[in-house]
Design a protein with these regions (language model features):
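Hydrophobic face of amphipathic alpha-helices that form TPR/SEL1-like repeat modules
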Residues: 1-26, 51, 352
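A structural signal for short, well-ordered beta-strand elements
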Residues: 20, 34, 58, 91, ...
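Glycine-rich loop-to-alpha-helix module at the N-terminal edge of alpha/beta enzyme cores
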Residues: 31-119
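Rossmann-like NAD(P) dinucleotide-binding subdomain of oxidoreductase/dehydrogenase enzymes
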Residues: 121-265, 394
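ALDH superfamily catalytic-core signature
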Residues: 229-374, 437, 484-488
Length: 488
């Protein structure tokens, strides 16, 4: 069956190109999918434009749109097993992680399905008799949604659900490495009753399939989650038509541990913060900042436990984390570790490719801890996006804040302390979109997600996540019109 979904039809690529998708855990062939080029994407944009300008979707009521999203949530639950398996095959992540993701994805559709019916505008009190003044919400238009490979369907849901809730039409381009759950989602949207052209899917690499999404005049908004350099290029491309842009560009996230923290919990969560999904998480706590008096004991325990983490494929029930996404990405991570060692970091564990049965064929890299790091090191400043933990020391609150904020990113981070006042002070001073106190990684669809500084702008999830895909319009109606006689 063809894999591009354009104007309500499944079709192959115009130039008949295809791409093999292989599991990063063992190199096995997952499938062969159609590979879109620029012509396919332009056709998808045209379909989305027609559907927005002439089709029924933007003119449906909020309740109708919400009902469709709730139907999609039910279909996601129905197909959970197939979706989780497909996600794990494409990404290499453990099946249990993918299963959790599908639950979160269904909840995301439910949240926006319910929110849109309650967010319908407001009456404005003008203080003037004879005036009816209202602010109403309207869709932005045609939205280009570009999603990454680390959480393919989850990141897609964060964009598709609010975009549809607001009444937009869209063209979705997932990562070329992890397309299968996006294909499945478009089938579910069609099954739920989404009109032709309202949702379109193109597969392929950014320079070919993705390029028209940034500069095409018929695209009204681009929402992108991915790397900083690609985000910068998209901003530049979008500037020619002054289209709306929302960007989530990752982070280099601090995990700050004070000496008065709950030791066992802080150690446990420091491991989860950075080694979950082999560190391929935009909010990964890759920078461990430890109060100097606690440093030796804390880092020794982190190293002991990190050294025991078992690597394995998505269906290995004994595995605790999986492979990196590709050979090229593993080489990038290795280069950052090598650079860190050159700059003076101390290797405490990991740092070399593992070998053995079940590992040689995949893109595995072990949990790695680099101690005695300095703030200026590339491995501390840049997003390596792998299972690499850098460790820095601090002695005062002010120093902890300075180190935590000493990066171009500002996505997320955590503070570990038993002192509530101290936690509140740090949360207020950290330039981060999310601050966890005595926890790491949880999120809910009701609360906004996004970053400060070069982690991007715009928000996903929460009421602001819906607002990203809306325009506001003020309607002023004079109920008793009369001449002003301003001019004679």
């Amino acid at each position: 069956m063809p894999d591009l979904f354009i104007d309500g039809e499944w079709r192959g690529a115009v130039d008949e190109r295809t791409r093999e998708i292989r599991c990063p855990a063992d190199g096995s062939l997952v499938g062969v999918v159609d590979e879109a080029g620029g012509k396919d994407t332009v056709e998808a944009i045209a379909a989305a434009r027609r559907a927005f300008d002439e089709g029924p979707w933007p003119r449906t009521s909020p309740n109708e749109r919400g009902d469709l999203l709730l139907r999609v949530a039910d279909l996601l639950v129905r197909d959970k097993d197939a979706l989780a398996r497909a996600e794990s095959l494409d990404t290499g992540k453990r099946l249990v992680e993918s299963e959790y993701d599908i639950d979160d994805i269904a909840n995301c559709f439910r949240y926006f399905g319910r929110l849109v019916a309650s967010e319908t505008g407001r009456v404005v009190d003008t203080g003037t008799a004879g005036v009816d003044s209202r602010v109403v919400y309207e869709p932005v238009g045609v939205c280009a949604l570009i999603t990454p490979w680390n959480y393919p369907l989850l990141q897609t849901a964060w964009k598709v659900a609010p975009a549809l809730a607001a009444g937009n039409t869209f063209v979705l381009k997932p990562s070329e490495l992890t397309p299968h759950t996006a294909i499945h989602l478009l089938r579910l949207l069609a099954e739920a009753g989404l009109p032709p052209g309202a949702g379109n899917l193109v597969l392929g690499a950014g320079p070919e399939a993705g390029a028209p999404l940034g500069d095409h005049p018929d695209v009204d908004m681009v929402s992108f989650t991915g790397g900083l350099q690609t985000g910068r290029r998209l901003m530049a491309a979008a500037s020619g038509t002054v289209k709306k842009v929302a960007l989530e560009l990752g982070g280099k996230n601090p995990n700050i541990v004070f000496a008065d923290a709950d030791f066992e919990t802080a150690v446990d969560m420091a491991l989860t913060a950075v080694f979950l999904h082999s560190g391929q998480v935009c909010s990964a706590g890759a920078r461990l900042l430890v109060e100097d008096s606690l440093h030796d004991r804390f880092v020794d325990e982190v190293v002991r436990r990190a050294s025991a983490i078992r690597l394995g494929g998505p269906f290995d029930e004994r595995a605790q984390t999986g492979p990196l996404i590709s050979a090229a990405h593993r080489e990038k991570v290795e280069a950052y570790v090598a650079k860190g060692l050159e700059e003076g970091a101390v290797l405490r564990c990991g740092g070399a490719r593992p070998s053995g049965p079940g590992l040689d064929e995949g893109f595995y890299y072990p949990p790695t801890v680099l101690d005695e790091c300095a703030a200026g090191m590339a491995v501390v400043q840049d997003e390596s996006f792998g299972p690499v933990l850098t460790v820095e020391r601090f002695t005062t609150e002010d120093e902890a804040v300075r180190l935590a904020n000493d990066t171009i990113y500002g996505l997320a981070g955590a503070v570990w302390t038993s002192d509530e006042a101290k936690a509140a002070r740090l949360a207020a001073r950290l330039r981060l979109g999310t601050v966890w106190i005595n926890d790491y990684h949880p999120y809910v669809p009701q609360a906004e997600w996004g970053g400060f500084k070069q982690s991007g702008f715009g928000r996903e999830l929460g009421p602001s996540g819906l607002a990203e895909y809306r325009e506001t319009k003020h309607i002023w109606r004079n109920t008793a019109p009369a001449p002003q006689e301003w001019f004679a």
